[in-house]
Amino acid sequence: DLVRSRGLGDVYKRQFLHWCKRMKYSDNEVYALYGCKEPTYGDPFYLTSEERNVLYDADLSENPKLAVIRDIFVFHCYIGCRVGDLYRLTRENIKDGFLEYMPQKTKKCQAKTVRVPLHEKALKILERYDVNADRLFPFKPIHTYNLGIRELLKYCGIDRMVTILDTHGYNTVQKPLHEVASSHTARKTFVGNLYKQVPDPNLIASLSGHVEGSRAFRRYRTIDDDMKRKLVEMIN
């Protein structure tokens, strides 16, 4: 049963069994007889630029804690990094209007500095916070951040239904966006909206910190209805 389980767990278990063999804890190689399926992913869901702007423009003066979550999340939507990299950022990462950082996840296989030009709205968000602080924002634990994102979207009426895969990865279900959003939604919002404008995986990867040729971009190649209409309108 161990080697037949599906999804990401299968990958981790195979790695663990390889490690046991290297450490000479076991010489049983029965796991090598089984294939390892790639994890199943659905089409990515993310905020449209209009939905992101609703958050940016929302009056949260009566809810200062949610206002901080909003600032972090919208800023995150404009830079597209992984949440672990976001939490490491300081003012020293900002140089001449660019955000510079080295993604921790890929630095061993591709040690490249990512440079992201900061959008005007991202710069305005930063102006609200102490330039002498240790970090860009007063971050909370990631779990708290994720819960705050969902509360924020619900508060602002971002309730569009999105299609996701269930926990087994085989059946699709419909959920309101505010029930399933997380810190990773900010990264997908950055990539998804860029991909609509310039469907060039390598160019976007240079901004998002993905490794060149990343399989993640396969998920963004489903052309939406608006892009289809634009293509048809180009036919004379």
Regions found by a protein language model. Name each.
Residues 17-29, 76-97:
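Short, charged phosphate-coordinating catalytic segments
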Residues 41, 107-170:
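C-terminal catalytic core of Y-nucleophile DNA break-rejoin enzymes
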Residues 1-12:
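Single conserved hydrophobic/aromatic residue that forms the stacking wall/gate
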Residues 61-63, 131-135, 150-206, 210:
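Short, basic (Lys/Arg/His-rich) helix/loop patches that form interaction surfaces
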Residues 39-67:
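Long, amphipathic, Lys/Arg-enriched alpha-helical "connector/arm" segment
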Residues 105-107, 142-145, 208-234:
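Catalytic-site neighborhood detector that most strongly recognizes the C-terminal catalytic loop/helix
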Residues 35, 79, 88-127:
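Conserved tyrosine-mediated DNA breakage-rejoining catalytic core shared by Y-recombinases
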